[in-house]
Amino acid sequence: MLSLLGATTLMLVAGRWVLPAASGEANLKSENVEIHIIDDNFFLKWNSSSESVRNVTFSADYQILGTDNWKKLPGCQHITSSKCNFSSVELKDVFEKIELRIRAEEGNNTSTWYEVEPFVPFLKAQIGPPDVHLEAEDKAIILSISPPGTEDSIMWALDRSSFRYSVVIWKNSSSLEERTETVYPEDKIYKLSPEITYCLKVKAELRLQSRVGCYSPVYCINTTERHKVPSPENVQINVDNQAYVLKWDYPYESTTFQAQWLRAFLKKIPGKHSNKWKQIPNCENVTTTHCVFPRDIFSMGIYYVRVRASNGNGTSFWSEEKEFNTEVKPIIFPPVISMKSITDDSLHVSVSASEESENMSVNQLYPLVYEVIFWENTSNAERKVLEKRTDFTFPNLKPLTVYCVKARALIENDRWNKGSSYSDTVCEKTKPGNTSKTWLIAGICTALFSILVVIYVVRVFLRCVKYVFFPSSKPPSSVDQYFSDQPLRNLLLSTSEEQTERCFIIENASIITEIEETNEVAEVHEEYNSQASQDSGNYSNEDENSGSKISEEFLQQDSV
């Protein structure tokens, strides 16, 4: 038992006590005085330097603080060793302070008393290891745990039903696959494999006091071979209007089922509870994998249910026990999510109730909160937030980026974390930012400029092609100016006309003078017309012949 000591000890460094020095005797002294309390076991231990002195014993007294009534400490009188057990001391109250004193003795000689600092037994007590009993099934182990101490323990009399037990279990063949579970005094460990040796150890805890006990010794047991009739699995209980619906999975037909219930608080009380399970109405000898029973069977509280199967070959073990709370069991459907981009760096999210949700009392009786998971579509990094509002905004986002969101409804301040499944995932892209607009405008302008440049280059290219392969029938103006004089225009006349000489018989000299003046005017007019027609590239004989026509007219008039 002393090997278990060490977590909660009272260690005192005592001064020496000295026996009267006699002839050949040495001084006697004590060094570390320690008090250990485990459950209802009390131990006093000290170190002494008087081993070389023979016939030295030690005795201790105790008293309740403030009574001034020292009594001999049972089990600690005339002790020759350096420890004693005073568990037989009769203490009426473990919350009262106790004083201890100890001295050394040799014959009729005694040292002075050394008084230990007063202590409260309950505050110094260490929780001891619980006692464990095991029973095996094919896929489970039944635990029966006795609280630390004895049935009439004074130390834990008020806490026997407050203990919680932590179990560490592993396969005997591999200690690396350890699994830790919190269990009740009468409980089961599920999800095991048939015909496997499992080992476990258990420790007790008082969570409200933050006190943790010692582990029990290691216990090992073999699970049985696979049972011929398997147990039902995936037991669930839901609410449908004014009734409960209990469902489970089972692989075979032609099987009957039975379901039972138990109040949850009974599992906290040590002892057997197999006879306290009660039959659920309408769930006995049913041939379907579900049964329906009225809600008024259960008052407000927490319960456990279990199911087992039967056929002509036998009866299965009980299924895994399912806990449910009558206050929060109504079904919560997943919400409907919508998301809209409002700016370049924010998205607005709206949460609404599902159309399938018919039990509106859930929203009225229990306030809901929404667990929202938000992430960038190209990233696995998720942001999880709890929102009481049905409309909220995610700010500080990237422009032109796709974000996704999903959510589920939870009952606020629910310690069992009951909630719906997650909604469908909704994704939305943020709007372009100012920088994006600037780049967009710049891109459009660049594209337009590029188009104009391309058009200009194409036109120049086409003109070059036309000039090379399809030249104009008219000579250019620079060439045409050399052909603007009168002698050159005569080249365009026919050969016959060029070789013809015109002769005139002039009888009146005055007419000749008028004709010459007229010809001078015509020449001036011709020169003007020639300059005006150089750019057009057109050649005309009209001006060239105008002089001759005028001369002919004058001749005709003269002849008349």
Curated annotation (Swiss-Prot):
Record-level GO BP terms: cellular response to interferon-alpha; response to lipopolysaccharide; type I interferon-mediated signaling pathway
Post-translational modification: Ubiquitinated, leading to its internalization and degradation. Polyubiquitinated via 'Lys-48'-linked and 'Lys-63'-linked ubiquitin chains, leading to receptor internalization and lysosomal degradation. The 'Lys-63'-linked ubiquitin chains are cleaved off by the BRISC complex.
Modification sites for Phosphotyrosine: Y467, Y482
Classification of source organism: Eukaryota, Metazoa, Chordata, Craniata, Vertebrata
Protein name: Interferon alpha/beta receptor 1
Glycosylation sites (chain numbering): N47, N55, N85, N108, N109, N172, N222, N285, N313, N359, N377, N434
GO cellular component: a single term: lysosome
Tissue: Expressed in the endometrium. Expressed in all tissues examined except conceptus at day 15 of pregnancy.
Quaternary structure (record): Heterodimer with IFNAR2; forming the receptor for type I interferon. Interacts with TYK2. Interacts with STAT1 and STAT2; the interaction requires its phosphorylation at Tyr-482. Interacts (serine-phosphorylated form) with FBXW11, the substrate recognition component of a SCF (SKP1-CUL1-F-box protein) E3 ubiquitin-protein ligase complex. Interacts with SHMT2; this promotes interaction with ABRAXAS2 and the BRISC complex. Interacts with TRIM10; this interaction prevents association between IFNAR1 and TYK2.
Spans within the Cytoplasmic topological domain: 459-560
Organism from which the protein derives: Ovis aries (Sheep)
Its biological purpose: Together with IFNAR2, forms the heterodimeric receptor for type I interferons (including interferons alpha, beta, epsilon, omega and kappa). Type I interferon binding activates the JAK-STAT signaling cascade, resulting in transcriptional activation or repression of interferon-regulated genes that encode the effectors of the interferon response. Mechanistically, type I interferon-binding brings the IFNAR1 and IFNAR2 subunits into close proximity with one another, driving their associated Janus kinases (JAKs) (TYK2 bound to IFNAR1 and JAK1 bound to IFNAR2) to cross-phosphorylate one another.
Pfam families noted in UniProt: Interfer-bind, Tissue_fac
